[in-house]
Amino acid sequence: LTIAYGQRHVIEVERARQVAAALGASKHTIISLDLRTIGGSALTSEFEVPKDRISSGQRQGIPITYVPGRNLIFLSLAAAHAEVLGASLIYFGANVLDYSGYPDCRPEFLQAFEQAVMKGTKAGVEGKPLHIRAPLLEMTKADIIRKGLQLGAPLHLTHSCYDPIGTLACGRCD
């Protein structure tokens, strides 16, 4: 499942399509919604994406790259999709160790969301719970790359940049 949410880094959606194809996904659903109408983030508005913030001391408060409600919305869509498919697990790529200050990338958010899904979905009420798995949550970015290499993941197809220059990462954003 990929969500095109009006992000300035739309290359992310194309790369997700390529990764799904490379991994032989039987189905790759792309949901489009436009969070630019809400605004409030450098990823969906005209605010400048912060660059060169190397030390955690430079990071105070919730950064301008936080998209209000993004992961809440994404996980809600994933839960609805999983319920329709009859799936019991949702895998989510949140990471807390290289924490950017996003409140919706914390373990307590994921635990609370899973509880909400248990109480607010047909699957949960009928005793077929949906569980959230975030295997990258406690890994550093370097550990994530190492694990990807170990698993033979098509890392050359991935994209992780908020302010790309064409198809290339800027090398300076968070």
Over which residues does each language-model region extend?
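ATP-dependent adenylation/nucleotidyltransferase module used to activate substrates
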Residues: 1-152
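Local cysteine-cluster metal-coordination motifs and their immediate loop/turn environment
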Residues: 76, 159-174
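Short hydrophobic/aromatic-enriched beta-strand-loop microsegments
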Residues: 155-157
